[in-house]
UniProtKB/Swiss-Prot annotation:
Record bears the keyword Chloroplast: yes
Alphabetized UniProt keyword annotations: Chloroplast, Plastid, Ribonucleoprotein, Ribosomal protein, RNA-binding, rRNA-binding
Protein name: Large ribosomal subunit protein uL22c
Functional note: This protein binds specifically to 23S rRNA.
GO molecular function: rRNA binding; structural constituent of ribosome
HAMAP family in the record: Ribosomal_uL22_B
Localization terms from the record: Plastid, Chloroplast
Pfam families: Ribosomal_L22
Family under the similarity heading: Belongs to the universal ribosomal protein uL22 family.
GO cellular component: chloroplast; large ribosomal subunit
Gene designation per UniProt: rpl22
InterPro entries: Ribosomal_uL22 (IPR001063), Ribosomal_uL22_bac/chlpt-type (IPR005727), Ribosomal_uL22_bac/org-type (IPR047867), Ribosomal_uL22_sf (IPR036394)
Description of how the protein assembles with itself and partners: Part of the 50S ribosomal subunit.
Top-level taxon of origin: Eukaryota
């Protein structure tokens, strides 16, 4: 099992054992990945696929988790990660003529929706640890550095000619 750090700006919802092929669910998930919450809700309500309803419920549940548990505003939420994995296959037998039976395989999938709060952009500020050698011993300090990327060619940089 891989342990990951919990991000305090992300909220997720997980749906398991959804009776649907993962290929059909991925067709819808690929359309909403990276979009805002409000835009995603409009897209899912208007798409004509059967896979939209369980995904709509998951996105709505993730947004409810974000607003209730973390206090995020729904206008600032963006779908940062959406993935569909294959679940277990439900196997049944269908009775046929003359005592025979045919197998029926119902595929299931698990869907994970991760919403990220964009009002606080954590990529702009990175935390660095550095050590200082002082007479009392080594001291470890944390420093927050602004890591925004400035385009020096278009914002009055060195070689900008007008």
């Amino acid at each position: 099992m891989i342990k990951t750090k919990k991000n305090r700006y992300e909220v997720y919802a997980l749906g398991q054992h959804i009776c649907m092929s993962p290929h059909k669910a991925r067709r819808v998930i690929d359309q909403i990945r990276g979009r805002s919450y409000e835009e995603t809700m409009m897209i899912l309500e208007l798409m004509p696929y059967r896979a939209c309803y369980p995904i709509l419920k998951l996105v709505y549940s993730a947004a409810a988790n974000a607003s209730h548990n973390m206090g995020f505003n729904e206008r600032d939420l963006v779908i940062s990660k959406a993935e569909v994995n294959q679940g277990t296959t439900v196997k049944k037998l269908k009775p046929r003529a003359q005592g025979r039976s045919y197998p029926i395989k119902r595929p299931t999938c698990s869907i994970t929706i991760v919403l990220k709060n964009t009002s606080v952009n954590e990529e702009e500020f990175k935390r660095y640890q550095y050590t200082i050698n002082q007479p009392g011993g080594l001291i470890t300090k944390e420093k927050y550095t602004d890591m925004r990327c400035y385009d020096m060619y278009n914002n009055g940089g060195l070689w900008d000619k007008k």
